Amino acid sequence: MLTTGMFLLEGSLLSPNPGLIFWTAVTFLLLLLLLKKLAWGPILSALEEREKSIQSAIDRANSAKDDAEKLLSKNKDAMNKAEVEADRIIKEGKEYAEKMRNEIVTKAQEEAKKIAAQAKAEIEQEKQQALNALRDEVATLAVKGAEKIIRMNLDAEKHKAVVEGMLEDLSTKRN
C-alpha cells in the first residue's frame, strides 16, 4: 500500500513527464519509419491496384451498358422496321385478296350471264321446236279432218262431231 501511495504522490500518468514524452515520440517515429519502409509501400500499391481494378470494372460495366443500350436501340429499330414491314405485307395481302374477290365475283357474274343466255337460247329453241311440232300436228290434224269432212260430206251436226273428236284427239296428244 505504501508503494501505491507513493506512486500517487509522485505524479499520475496524466501529468506530463518529459522523459516519457521523448521516448514515446521516438518510439512513434521509429514505428512510423518502420511501417513506411515495410508496410506503407505494399499497402499503397495494393490500394492503387485495387483502385485500378475497380476503375477497370467500372469502365467495363459502362462499356457493357453502352453496348447494351446500342443493342437495345438496334433491336427497337429492327422491331419497328419489322412492324412496318408486317403492316405493309398485311395491307398488300388484303389488297390482293380484295382484288381476287372482285375478279372472282366478276367472273362468276359473267358466267352466270352466259349460263342464263344459254338457258334462254335453249328455252327459245325448244319453244320453237314445240311450236313447230304443234303446227305440224295441227296442220296434219286439220288436213285429216278436212279429208274426213270431204269424204263424208256430212251435214252440220256430223261436221261438228268430227271437229270435236279431232279436238279431243289433239288435247289427249298434248297431255
UniProtKB/Swiss-Prot annotation:
Pfam families: ATP-synt_B (PF00430). The chain crosses the membrane at residues 13-33. Signal peptide: none annotated. It is a single-pass membrane protein. It is found in: Cell inner membrane. GO terms for molecular function: proton-transporting ATP synthase activity, rotational mechanism; proton-transporting ATPase activity, rotational mechanism. InterPro entries: ATP_synth_B-like_membr_sf, ATP_synth_b/b'su_bac/chlpt, ATP_synth_F0_bsu_bac, ATP_synthase_B_chain. Keywords: ATP synthesis, Cell inner membrane, Cell membrane, CF(0), Hydrogen ion transport, Ion transport, Membrane, Transmembrane, Transmembrane helix, Transport. Coiled coil: none annotated. One of its GO terms (cellular component) is proton-transporting ATP synthase complex. The keyword DNA repair does not apply. HAMAP family: ATP_synth_b_bprime. Belongs to the ATPase B chain family. F-type ATPases have 2 components, F(1) - the catalytic core - and F(0) - the membrane proton channel. F(1) has five subunits: alpha(3), beta(3), gamma(1), delta(1), epsilon(1). F(0) has four main subunits: a(1), b(2) and c(10-14). The alpha and beta chains form an alternating ring which encloses part of the gamma chain. F(1) is attached to F(0) by a central stalk formed by the gamma and epsilon chains, while a peripheral stalk is formed by the delta and b chains. F(1)F(0) ATP synthase produces ATP from ADP in the presence of a proton or sodium gradient. F-type ATPases consist of two structural domains, F(1) containing the extramembraneous catalytic core and F(0) containing the membrane proton channel, linked together by a central stalk and a peripheral stalk. During catalysis, ATP synthesis in the catalytic domain of F(1) is coupled via a rotary mechanism of the central stalk subunits to proton translocation. This is ATP synthase subunit b. The lineage of its organism: Bacteria, Pseudomonadati, Chlorobiota, Chlorobiia, Chlorobiales. The gene is atpF.
